[in-house]
Amino acid sequence: MNFNDYKYEHLDLEKIKGQFSELIDSFERAENVEGQIEAFDKIIKLRNHIETMQTLVSIRHSIDTNDEFYDKENEYMDEISPILFGFTNDFYKALVNSKFKDELIKKYGKLLFDLAENTLKVFSNEIIPDAQEENRLSSKYSKLIASAKIDFDGKELNLSQMVPYTQSKDRNVRIEAAKKVAQFFAENQEEFDNIYDSLVKVRTKMAQKMGYKNYVEFGYKQLSRLEYDAKMVEGYRKQVLENIVPLHTELRKRQEKRLGVEKLRFYDEAIKFNSGNADPHGSPEWILNHGKTMYKELSKETDEFFTFMTENNLLDLLSKKGKMSGGYCTYIPEYKAPFIFANFNGTAHDIDVLTHEAGHAFQVYQSRGFDVPEYLWPTYEACEIHSMSMEFLTWPWMKLFFENDTDKYKFIHLSEALLFIPYGVTVDEFQHWVYENPEVTPQDRREKWLEIEKKYLPTRDYGEVDELKNGIFWFRQVHIFSSPFYYIDYTLAQVCAFQFWIKSREDREKAWQDYLNLCKLGGSKSFFELMKSANLKNPFEEGTLAAVIPKIKEYLDSVDDMNL
């Protein structure tokens, strides 16, 4: 069934409230485990319907933020989603207190109960107004980003459309593009500062209402981090500082030499070669056709999956006016359909989206047989393993897109993945400091950003882009506003994806089997258990980075990048 035919209906809150209440009541009054399972199944059906409507609004609103109908529905969803979550929470209470708990654990697994108990620690009806305010502020940020109209090259462009100019072979074009983008953020500095300040305050208020000292521990629990805490993440950041930051500096020096510039500036970072980066050699349609070939040849499972996606119009890839920036994958439960949203811009990023978001989509397609919604996706850090590993597992097909620039693409891809990690931990350390010190001023935050940036990105130099010397670079990082503490997950997953890259070069078949099994498990196991089942070393364990990173360095050192 085509995505355009997926039916949307406005959710009636009172009706849903009555349905939940009735079903939870029959779950609690059930005289045997069979009765509870029957009620449980009906609750899942209701939750799937709600989730489907929420997702359809979210997708259609992000495709066209100017569509008045879905703009209004999106505001309505922001308003009611915390209340709807409250209904699920009421079910969790009934579930963990079930008199047939042992039998239910046998049927559904203990993880569901651990997740339910964890959620009960971060939600109560008392914080619904705060969660609504958080949603409203998050949407306000997205709209502000989408509102960018930058006059450049005789056109009016949004932020996604500015990316090719920031990667131009002409240094002067790069400088001007970087300045124009920075000016947008500088001109709106007060509004970005105010939105973030309000978000920090409202999140802190929620955490304190729920009995936490600050938002840090509360935020971790919201992300269902059952196995690690802020202390362990701090230890991991230390490993990054010791094992990756020196290599980061080395790679930036190589880049400086390749580009033949006296000093590598911020606006040079995105351009890897004077001859230009490796860009795909064709149109979006051409890319999609090669994508079909790639997934057909990769495995029978990926062939079936990608055929389903293309035949049902489940990819929205082109950048257009009023469309939100970025890329994501989501899932529409009633249709058992993943959906990929992206903004193609003619750069290698288009291919990364095609592999990265397809990694997410492929995983949920493999695990869509789970009835329990909690098992469709794993927790965030595990989710990112599928997407980032798919980027590497598709390497043998990169020649379809890049032709004689394939070696260049691979060098850029692998080095960029490594260069990303210190930036990822910069974002993470910044957020920990922000939520540990919620009362500081926006100016303090901007100064702290620059200080942490210096620690993990010692080569960064903003050159003539004076606006960024004021510590506003992070305004463009959507996760800092809308998904606190999520960003470190990309770096943890990157370390796991590096291991898949290493394994695929040693034994491709075995690497694919490990990956496929990981996808099939969905969210039915915890992060640490999933890593174990895929034969991956845990990034938190001392020595993991020291074991993985040298193999990446060895490959990068073997490339004659001066002649690519």
Language-model regions: role of each:
Residues A342-S367, E384-S387, F392, F430, ...:
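Active-site recognition of the HExxH zinc-binding catalytic motif
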Residues M1-N277, H281, L564:
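A well-structured
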Residues T310-G327, K336-P338, P458-F481:
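Flexible, glycine/threonine-enriched loop-and-boundary segments that flank and lead into catalytic domains
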Residues S275-E334, T347-A348:
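Auxiliary, metal-adjacent structural segments of Zn-dependent hydrolase domains
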Residues Y196-A207, Y212-K213, L251-Q255, G359-G369, ...:
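Long, well-ordered alpha-helical segments
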Residues E227, L354, F362, S389, ...:
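C-terminal, non-catalytic "cap/extension" segments appended to globular domains
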Residues E242-N243, S367, P378-T406, H413-L414, ...:
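Post-HExxH zinc-binding segment in Zn-dependent metallohydrolases
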Residues V122-F123, V181-N188, Y228-E234, E269-P280, ...:
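Glycine- and acidic
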